[in-house]
Amino acid sequence: MGKFDGVLLVSDFDDTMVDTSSLYRDPQHRLPPVPAYTVERLNYFMDNGGRFCLVTGRSWQIMRPFIDGVPTNGPCAVANGAGIIDISTEQFLYRRFLPADAIDRLKEILARFPDLTCELFRADHRADVIHPIAFTVEHAAGAKYTYRVIEDPRETDAEVIKILFEGENDFLRELEAYIHTRPWFAGYELAFSGLHLLELTAKGANKGEVTKKLMELLGTSPEHLYCAGDQANDLPMLRIGVESFAPANAIPAVLQSGVTVVRSCGEGAVGEVVDLLDRRYA
């Protein structure tokens, strides 16, 4: 029996576990590794009975190249809650993809914003992009994935997990306000995952609901759930933890949400979370 038996710690990946923001300052767009301190502390946590899972906004296509550098002993929740992947088989254990009418909804959005950049992440772990911009190229280079450029969303010939809108923050705020006025929005979720990233998923496909599904799959109790994240899309997850944590680099809305603030992501935020749990379960 380990001191962390029955404890589930879930964490966002980008700018919570790793300093993703730094790759946009690197000419070669290299993502730094998970800090050694975090790796050491997570291994200690798991060696003593704890379960650690990623709950990321990334699709599996974008998470897969980096998963070997993340100490984990559970499934990986992807695409802001649209799915849970068995890391060993790369198969979905749970799916909540966009509804069939999402392509028609996207066409309506594009009619209103004809130059909008969007990435359609597919259930077959591929991506289609409409109107790629420089940020799209940098995003793909940093995340080590390729995409197909299309002109019309109807060219996408697979189920769509999520749609990622890209652009300047002021423009995305205007887009967000427009989508919120649509009568069909009741069937969808919309959340910022970064300053230049706005994500559309199916209703119920959010980090809070997918964390509940992880607890169900792993047989863990809400009384021993701990969460870490830095962005607006992490808030549904952070709200359900017994105690939730945010790195010092988190956005103000997260820092002011009642979380426990730890060191920045690049300094080993999640490692410090384990240290705090070590004291709680002493």
Q: What does each of the following model-derived ranges do?
A:
Residues 13, 81, 229-231:
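Active-site metal-binding loops of divalent metal-dependent hydrolases
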Residues 115-228, 232-240, 249:
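Conserved acidic, metal-coordinating active-site core of Asp-based
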